């Protein structure tokens, strides 16, 4: 099993988005390992843990190939772990997947409400591009 950390910071990221303390200024200046994105991980290249707003930047860095990811487990519905607006980019016209398998998200009812709102708005579940599967703790 391959487990890759894509982000290990808290909600504000590191350095913090609107912070100008000495630690954040130094982290910005040094870059590299001194900069951390919001929490996210990838298991065996196919299972994504969380979908934060940093997901797009991770694809640009070459650390994440979303065309290979089939499943995404949302640990909880806080905005640093779930940014459902990015699901719109799975729409016809934005995404041309190599196959027709859906991107399946798993999460609690709370996460499901946020995800389904986006899926409904863009017709993503009806066209089979994205599916939400509710789960309960310890299932």
Locate each region found by the language model.
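Binuclear metal-dependent hydrolase catalytic cores
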Residues: 1-139
């Amino acid at each position: 099993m391959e487990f890759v950390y894509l982000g290990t910071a808290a909600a504000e990221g590191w350095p913090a988005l609107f912070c100008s303390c000495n630690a954040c200024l130094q982290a910005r200046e040094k870059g590299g390992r001194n900069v951390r994105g919001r929490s996210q991980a990838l298991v065996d290249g196919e299972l994504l843990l969380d979908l934060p707003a940093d997901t797009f930047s991770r694809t640009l860095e070459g650390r994440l190939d979303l065309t290979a990811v089939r499943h995404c487990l949302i640990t909880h519905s806080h905005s640093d772990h779930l940014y459902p607006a990015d699901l719109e980019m799975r729409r016809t016209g934005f995404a041309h997947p190599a196959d027709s398998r859906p991107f399946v998200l798993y999460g609690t009812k709370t996460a499901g409400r946020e995800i389904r709102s986006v899926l409904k708005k863009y017709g993503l579940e009806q066209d089979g591009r994205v599916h939400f599967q509710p789960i309960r703790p310890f299932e």
